[in-house]
């Protein structure tokens, strides 16, 4: 059996027996260190899959790579403290390309007062690969995907589809992770997720982990300027968060209501015929 066609969720089920208790259900690991909870996440960025130097500067690539990694911390309400960065690069790279990537990461790290604490380097005969591990702490255990309940409300922090518009128009997209918003929303007791693979795909991940379904109202999904409806539903690499919780908590948070959770463990989009539900590396 090949990987293609199994999907990321299917692959996760195959490796779950080899993971620690509770691991694999969320994009970030949450580990109690005796005093607080460490939130840590790792992301890979592959040239030709996640970024393209033909229309992105090295600094743009570095910024976006760190920003997307930090989205997992934002979803758990953790302020970033440090990152480890590993780079595999072809021998043909110019030195300025490497330093430019790090410059972009440094700018964003400085914005959040975090540190690039180390990493590793290697050569490769294939495309370049960046691997970023990011970490921070929270004082309480954030809700996991598996914790959501039927009858809860689904909300988003803002308009979706900006990343898809940037990709379509080949424009650099320097998103800013909603770290402080994530802290606030988690303190309200909401289960949050970053929209790295699209809104519908993120809800499919919540459903797979919780065995709780969802009905999304396409007409209620706020769209970024220039974004088509399908782009708002499926665009990944978005800065916004999707949050799930009791209706009063979602409305108290001031979120845009886009749906509700259901007993049946499937995700239904009302008002749109989607050709795809979002990005999946192994679909």
Regions found by a protein language model. Name each.
Residues 35-38, 45, 79-164:
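Glycine-rich anion-binding loops of enzyme active sites
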Residues 44, 85-88, 120-122, 159-160, ...:
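Short, ordered loop/turn segments at secondary-structure junctions
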Residues 3, 7, 175, 252-283:
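Acidic, Ser/Thr/Pro-rich beta/coil linker or hinge segments at domain junctions
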Residues 30, 69, 77, 116, ...:
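Residue-level signal for inorganic ion chemistry
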